[in-house]
From Swiss-Prot:
Localization of this protein: Periplasm
Gene: ybhG
Matching PANTHER family: EFFLUX SYSTEM COMPONENT YKNX-RELATED (PTHR32347), UPF0194 MEMBRANE PROTEIN YBHG (PTHR32347:SF29)
UniProt-recorded name of the protein: UPF0194 membrane protein YbhG
Organism: Escherichia coli O6:K15:H31 (strain 536 / UPEC)
UniProt similarity note: Belongs to the UPF0194 family.
Region forming the signal peptide: 1-15
Coiled coil found in the keyword field: yes
GO CC terms in record: periplasmic space
């Protein structure tokens, strides 16, 4: 073969390779990035925050539930009684606090003053009697025991007088700040116990936290539950999230707010629409559940994609193909 012919063939082959590479690159650009993921499985165990006997359950397995819907109730009676006791405790503490703030009435002060006069008279009598007994003791008219009895009576009367004087002084000056503060603290404690009793009564009714589908019903009416015991397991149906993974090469395309198309095997020609809501800040090895064997050993970043037009056909755990491209649009 002549040399010019060989050179010509080489040029043709090289041109074909370049053209093929360009076509492949261009097709990749046109088609955009494709990722694979699954609809997130989101379940929650529902329980009463308080314990008690299950009075009634309003739903069964497979039922659709709405946020705020009553799902079950415990026997309310113990919590209603506790609430009544807490209300009574607040009333007592409030009355005591009000008394502390108001101080003492004029009638109480007058009674305390009269008690001081009576105690003073008793002390004066006891002191005079003791003085006389001392004179008799010196003249050896009475025994030492008689003198000691007189001294004891005098000391007791003196203590009674001091107590009455202190009480009158307190009545006239009002309650001490420490006593008022203690009464206020007792009132606040009673109010906190009332709030707790109200919350316990409220929590004896189980309410759905969000829309979903009931997967399991773990107990039946009549069951006595501890607080936190699982009653239902619920699959959360809204919002619908798709979990996918992107490698570092394509991370710049998967920015929060980016719109994507979501394809399922059941409707390959009618995609759902989604928007990237979260990109993990840390890399991880691709989970085995991802349908991309070539990426399973790579370090990737987890994406959460919010499906904006989800319907009941998009079920949790379903494999999804995530398509990036101009047709998906950008934020």
């Amino acid at each position: 073969m002549k040399k010019p012919v060989v050179i010509g063939l080489a040029v043709v082959v090289l041109a074909a390779v370049v053209a093929g590479g360009y076509w492949w690159y261009q097709s990749r650009q046109d088609n955009g990035l494709t990722l694979y993921g699954n609809v997130d499985i989101r379940t929650v165990n529902l329980s009463f925050r308080v314990g008690g006997r299950v009075e009634s359950l309003a739903v069964d397995e497979g039922d659709a539930i709405k946020a705020g819907q009553v799902l079950g109730e415990l026997d309310h009676k113990p919590y209603e009684i506790a609430l009544m006791q807490a209300k009574a405790g607040v009333s007592v503490a409030q009355a005591q606090y009000d008394l502390m703030l108001a101080g003492y009435r004029d009638e109480e002060i007058a009674q305390a003053a009269a008690a001081v006069k009576q105690a003073q008279a008793a002390y004066d009598y006891a002191q005079n009697f003791y003085n006389r007994q001392q004179g008799l003791w010196k003249s050896r008219t009475i025994s030492a025991n008689d003198l000691e009895n007189a001294r004891s009576s005098r000391d007791q009367a003196q203590a009674t007088l001091k107590s009455a004087q202190d009480k009158l002084r307190q009545y006239r000056s009002g309650n001490r700040e420490q006593d008022i503060a203690q009464a206020k603290a007792s009132l606040e404690q009673a109010q906190a116990q009332l709030a707790q009793a109200e919350l316990n009564l409220q929590d004896s009714t189980l309410v759905a936290p969000s829309d979903g589908t009931l997967l399991t019903r773990a107990v039946e009416p009549g069951t006595v539950l501890n607080e936190g015991g699982t009653v239902f397991t619920v699959s959360l149906t809204r919002p619908v999230w798709v979990r996918a993974y992107v490698d570092e090469r394509n991370l710049d395309q998967a920015q929060p707010g980016r719109k994507v198309l979501l394809y399922t095997d059941g409707r390959p020609n009618k995609p759902y629409h989604g928007q990237i809501g979260f990109v993990s800040p840390t890399a991880e090895f691709t989970p085995k559940t991802v349908e991309t064997p070539d990426l399973r050993t790579d370090l990737v970043y987890r994406l959460r994609i919010v499906v904006t037009d989800a319907d009941d056909a998009l079920r949790q755990g379903m494999p999804v193909t995530v398509q990036f491209g101009d047709e998906a649009g950008h934020e």
